[in-house]
Design a protein with these regions (language model features):
Chain B
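Ferredoxin-reductase
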Residues: 2-79
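Local cysteine-cluster metal-coordination motifs and their immediate loop/turn environment
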Residues: 186, 208-235
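FNR/FR-type flavoprotein reductase catalytic core
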Residues: 69-212
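Short, Lys/Arg- and Gly-enriched loop/turn segments at beta-strand edges
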Residues: 46-53, 90-97, 101, 231
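Short Fe-S-cluster ligation motifs
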Residues: 224, 228-233, 237-263
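Structural signal for conserved beta-strand scaffold positions within catalytic alpha/beta enzyme cores
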Residues: 12, 54, 151-153, 205, ...
Length: 311, 263
């Protein structure tokens, strides 16, 4: 690149252009159009809705989200007002901002995943993200769908068919026999991308005053800086195994974290818990951090460093 | 600010009447602004946000009325019981001279601590408080001692018969007040906003929405029209902020995030 040229942090993802590789992760500020619009205005290239199901869900009582020393613990219990409401919010947001919108969906059965995806496709989001890996909700066999190759294969196939022309990303968990093999299953079942990783655990905290678990659900998914190395390794392993683009998420809080994810091969980098640590400024801070780093290293485009940690 | 969960013993309980009690705790943070709130966890039940009714001589007071399952369960809390407390959260009221405090029902609670702060600064203020009956208006004694106070009840059991909003006009006109603070049922707040805007007065209003995390990440309390997170940028909004919001008096969201019509 010529010295006077400003580095370009825009990225191409599934044939669409994003102004930044940063994505708002599912579960944070993703309930309404106005909430997500604010995050796009803060510098995210895309936003992911909170996970929606066909029917409304009340979720767990509170406390349902708690900070601890290394991150956040949450057992919101997938509360949501139903996909029909999500579609209204997505339609509204599309008229207000041209940032990308990823719709996160889940179901209690593979068939419900299919109907939620079919319904979500009606609002034409840029991507449907399939939450097969929330640690707070289990399949009828008592394990998250994301732990079983057969369940993930089945759900991916059903959702891909239901989503029609809308691309599909499967959100994976590290709590499975092999996350790279799981990504391979997604690829072979027709997924367009994978998102890695969901929260880890579940974990728990006890209040020593009353000697009881503090989350109403007792246990909850662990996120935040503590899980970054786990997420990075998962992304690195997946991108070394499949050709699918990876939306990397898990504890990304700083520019350095985002760079590490891209060097491990991530197409996009999602940010969730860091909104707690760094406020909404986290998006503009990391955008600027990436630009500054690229300027210093004379790198014109993020494609130049993507996957470098594999070489 | 303490975001993490920690339990503290209740140091005292005051019964206003069987369905309204004040709970006292050691002051857990140096600076607590009027209008800010704490999330209170009743172990085994739930966690809900409550604004501070007073901070005085190292003790903070939270006043609760039994209106739902959580607050009814709270009425059984005794001195020595441990309650989880996180906070203080959100933005509180700022201090202004020559103000009118307009409170309705349990919305009166944060105004009580505000009144203490205004009084300590030596600022002039007046107060108008309303409730369904005499029992629904807390802290009438303190308010009446501290400032000219007008009381209004819907059944006429205390003060004037009627609604608070029928008297605001006259008080503002008579006393040349320039700033309004308000907290209470949303129908009342909407009328207060209209009245203040009509007169070109600045105001700060404490709003209420279903909250979960208290730390600005879950998105549950984001209000339409603005993207304002009420737990973080609120619960007290000034005129410029409040006027951006399009849902006041019309809709709010339940625990699932469903929009419900405002009563």
């Amino acid at each position: 690149m010529s010295l006077c040229m400003k580095p370009d942090i825009s990225v191409s993802f599934l044939n669409k252009t994003m102004s930044s590789p940063l994505v708002l992760a599912s579960g944070v500020l993703g309930l309404t159009a106005d909430s997500m619009k604010r995050v796009l205005e803060a510098g995210a290239g895309a936003v992911t809705t909170k996970s929606f199901s066909m029917d409304p869900r009340k979720g767990h009582p509170c406390p349902s989200i708690l900070p601890y020393d290394g991150g956040l613990l949450n057992a919101v219990g997938l509360s949501n007002p139903g996909v029909a409401e999500m579609n209204k919010e997505i339609r509204k947001l599309q008229t207000q901002h041209n940032g990308l919108i990823f719709a996160s969906v889940f179901g209690r059965t593979p068939e419900e995943f299919g109907s939620a995806a079919a319904s979500a496709a009606e609002s034409e989001p840029d991507l449907i993200e399939v939450n097969v890996s929330c640690p707070n909700v289990e399949s009828e066999f008592g394990t998250p769908f994301g732990a079983s190759f057969r369940d993930v294969e089945k759900i991916t196939t059903i959702v891909k068919k239901a989503a029609g022309s809308i691309p599909v990303s499967i959100k994976l968990t590290i709590h499975c026999p092999s996350i790279s093999k799981m990504a391979r299953v997604c690829e072979e079942s027709g997924a367009d991308a994978v998102t890695a990783i969901n929260t880890v655990g579940p974990g728990m905290l006890v209040d020593t005053g009353v000697m009881k678990p503090v989350l109403a659900n007792k246990v909850g998914g662990v996120s935040g800086p503590a899980i970054f190395p786990l997420a990075l390794k998962a992304v690195w392993e997946i991108t070394g195994t499949v050709r699918l683009p990876v939306i990397a998420t898990g504890g990304v809080t700083t520019t350095d974290h985002a760079l590490q994810m891209i060097m491990a091969g991530a197409a996009l980098v999602s940010i969730g818990s860091a909104v707690y640590y760094e406020e909404l400024d986290v998006f503009s801070k990391i955008n600027k951090g990436l630009t500054d780093w690229m300027t210093e290293r004379k790198i014109g485009n993020l494609q130049e460093i993507r996957g470098k940690a594999h070489e | 600010m303490s975001d993490k969960m920690k339990t503290y013993p209740v140091v005292d309980v005051k019964t206003h009447h069987p369905e309204m009690k004040s709970y006292y705790f050691r002051q857990i943070e140096e600076q607590i602004l009027p209008g800010q709130f704490f999330n209170l966890w009743l172990p085994g039940v739930d966690e809900k946000p409550f604004s501070v009714s007073d901070v005085y001589q190292g003790i903070m007071e939270i006043t609760i009325k039994a209106v739902g399952p959580f607050t009814r369960a709270f009425m059984n809390v005794k001195r020595g019981d441990r309650i989880g407390i996180r906070g203080p959260f959100g933005r509180g009221f700022t201090m202004h001279q020559h103000s009118l405090l307009i409170g309705g029902g349990m919305g009166i609670v944060p105004l009580r601590y505000l009144a203490r702060n205004l009084r300590e600064k030596g600022f002039h203020f007046e107060v108008i408080l309303g409730g369904r009956t005499e029992k629904d208006i807390p802290f009438t004694t303190e308010f009446s001692e501290w400032a000219p106070t007008t009381l209004v009840t819907e059944d006429g059991s205390l003060g004037y018969l009627g609604l608070v909003t029928q008297h605001i006009h006259e008080i503002i006109g008579r006393s040349k007040l320039s700033h309004i603070y308000s907290s209470g049922p949303e129908g009342m707040l909407v009328r207060v906003m209209e009245e203040a805007s009509g007169r070109g007065l600045d105001y700060e209003i404490s709003f209420e929405r279903y909250m979960k995390c208290g730390i600005g990440i879950c998105g549950q309390c984001v209000v339409d029209g603005s993207g304002i997170r009420l737990c973080k940028e609120g619960p007290v909004l000034n005129r410029e902020e409040a006027e951006k919001v399009t849902e006041w008096g019309m809709v709010h969201r339940d625990g699932a995030g469903r929009r419900e019509r405002e009563d």
